[in-house]
């Protein structure tokens, strides 16, 4: 295994304190050493089981503990999920992420989850799931089905974590990431900016991620979307430059990871998103109308790509093909009509 730089919170905090333009310059230099700066990986997210989650994550409208008006739904049928995946591929996404609002999957659900992974893989798309805590057997079963990525965010620093979540320990999250990695599945893990954390907490989160035995292949950075009925509905807005700093520091600390703009993009203007790409972000959730939090519509994403000279990255899976790249290229040139989104699309990053 490659040797990765071990970071301290002090070192990470020093990056946050750099003059912004110096920080962006360093992040962009590092980004160009490892990635094509014009390529952006695009994913679509689907809620396969919505609401009624027993967890108490203070930011999440899917928790059964808060009255947010969200209607809970049972686990979707495999056929419904695959139909949504077809629409996502037709719209140009190269990775299909499936999220379920529960603490952990039950044994009765595993055969359906495996079929979902197998079906999406057969379409030539990368697969990702976020299902909560996994044990060793579950991780290996999903790996055998062909799962490419597993998302399980750390959310914030270990020190601040207990102020946001009490129903799942920080160590439990780290243990799940370890089981996923040991099963041969790529790790997707990041956090949220705007929970009420300090800059030191942001530094602490990124240190936890960067100092994993191997840094996550994908690091989603979310901006808190304040939902009425959740305990954080009245939190202060996140300063755009502070969010951009977080993207830049993540890029510097994890040079080979994809850094994803996740929840909260609807709150960002084009200039903020452009600076995030400049800071090293190179992945987005594309064209999904998120179930519990809004996300820019497909045509807006495509128009922004065109303005910035960005290109959607082609996937490389066992069953991959060039059709996805061609579809996106055509849409960038002629973004007049796009497939309808399912109302099931949402941000399941947590």
UniProtKB/Swiss-Prot annotation:
Keywords tagged on the record: 2Fe-2S, 4Fe-4S, Biotin biosynthesis, Iron, Iron-sulfur, Metal-binding, S-adenosyl-L-methionine, Transferase
Protein EC: 2.8.1.6
Annotated residues for binding of [2Fe-2S] cluster: 97, 128, 188, 260
Domain Radical SAM core positions: 38-262
GO molecular function, one term: biotin synthase activity
InterPro entries reported for this sequence: Aldolase_TIM (IPR013785), BATS_dom (IPR010722), Biotin_synth/BioAB (IPR002684), Biotin_synthase (IPR024177), Elp3/MiaA/NifB-like_rSAM (IPR006638), rSAM (IPR007197)
Pathway linked to the protein: Cofactor biosynthesis; biotin biosynthesis; biotin from 7,8-diaminononanoate: step 2/2
Function: Catalyzes the conversion of dethiobiotin (DTB) to biotin by the insertion of a sulfur atom into dethiobiotin via a radical-based mechanism.
Family membership noted in the UniProt record: Belongs to the radical SAM superfamily. Biotin synthase family.
Protein name (database record): Biotin synthase
Source species: Yersinia enterocolitica serotype O:8 / biotype 1B (strain NCTC 13174 / 8081)
Lineage, uppermost ranks: Bacteria, Pseudomonadati, Pseudomonadota, Gammaproteobacteria, Enterobacterales
């Amino acid at each position: 295994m490659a040797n990765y730089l071990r970071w301290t919170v002090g070192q990470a905090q020093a990056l946050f304190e750099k003059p912004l333009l110096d920080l962006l310059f360093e992040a962009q230099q590092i980004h160009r050493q490892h990635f094509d700066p014009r390529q952006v990986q695009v994913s679509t997210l689907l809620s396969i089981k919505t609401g009624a989650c027993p967890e108490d994550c203070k930011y999440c409208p899917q928790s059964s503990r808060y009255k947010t008006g969200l209607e809970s739904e049972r686990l979707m049928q495999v056929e419904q999920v695959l139909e949504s995946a077809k629409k996502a591929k037709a719209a140009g996404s190269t990775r299909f992420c499936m999220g379920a609002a529960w603490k952990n999957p039950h044994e009765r659900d595993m055969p359906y989850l495996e079929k979902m992974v197998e079906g999406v893989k057969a379409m030539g798309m990368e697969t990702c799931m976020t299902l909560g805590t996994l044990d060793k057997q579950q991780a290996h079963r999903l790996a055998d089905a062909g799962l490419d990525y597993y998302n399980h965010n750390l959310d914030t620093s270990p020190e601040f974590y207990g102020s946001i979540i009490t129903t799942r320990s920080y160590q439990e999250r780290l243990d799940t990431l370890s089981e996923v990695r040991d099963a041969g599945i790529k790790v997707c893990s990041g956090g949220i900016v705007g929970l009420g954390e300090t800059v030191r907490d942001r530094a602490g989160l990124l240190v936890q991620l960067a100092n994993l035995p191997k840094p996550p292949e994908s690091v989603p950075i979310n901006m808190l979307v304040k939902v009425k009925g959740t305990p954080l509905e009245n939190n202060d807005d996140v300063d755009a430059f502070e969010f951009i700093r977080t993207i830049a520091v993540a890029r510097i600390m994890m040079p080979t990871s994809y850094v994803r703009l996740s929840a909260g993009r609807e709150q960002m203007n084009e200039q903020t998103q452009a600076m995030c790409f400049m800071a090293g972000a190179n992945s987005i959730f594309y064209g999904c109308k998120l179930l519990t939090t809004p996300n820019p519509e497909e045509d807006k994403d495509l128009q922004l790509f065109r303005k910035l000279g960005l290109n959607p990255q082609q996937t490389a899976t066992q069953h991959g093909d060039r059709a996805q790249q061609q579809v996106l290229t055509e849409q960038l040139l002629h973004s007049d009509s796009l497939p309808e989104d399912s109302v099931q699309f949402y941000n399941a990053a947590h």
